[in-house]
Amino acid sequence: MEQLKTFISPQMVNLIMSGQMNYDFSPRRAELTMLFSDLRGFTSLCDELEPEELAPILNEYLTEMTEIIFQHGGTIDRYLGDGIMTFFGAPIPDEKHPENAVSTALAMQAKLSELKEKWLGDAQRELGTGIGITTGYVTVGSFGPKSHKEYTVSGSNANIASRLSKIAEMAQVLISPRTCARVGDLFEVEPLGQRQFKGRATPMMVYHVKRTVRS
């Protein structure tokens, strides 16, 4: 049970431990929404700052982003340097996982703007996130040896979120058609055209989420 605290919110852990919420870590097929966030401009910052200056910045960034993810019911898959892979809809079922993922992305962008001003002040330095989101069926569950289990997702849909984040411009949130179909009336969304991704036989339409439109 201690392992739960590393990838879901303390509130969810308490609900599970009290028996108020069911969960399932065994491998299964499920429709989830995946989010991949990539921090842009951080590599150049690494080259300019000393480790003792850099560590507090990265730790604060990851802490703040994780808190936002947990607030929206997300599950941390893994941290990849300054990147974060997360998913919504497991281990606790959530019908609003596409909406919660997009809301998370916009909240992450807003928080980074605050942090950037705190860290860099008026310095003219580019620092922002590119975020990719997709909704689809993946395999989700606990994998690995007993000594190092990980609760993670696998499948082509999980990879698409990462590839969307890579083509996203700084401070841009890109989503797939399936995610767009589920949240298009809640957010202002702009179609950007077809893109070809590795592992897909046909091009895929990509959408840019600008802002929420729900009152």
Give residue ranges: language-model regions.
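Alpha-helical scaffold within the catalytic cores of cyclic-nucleotide enzymes
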Residues: L58-G74, A90-I131, T135, S156-S165
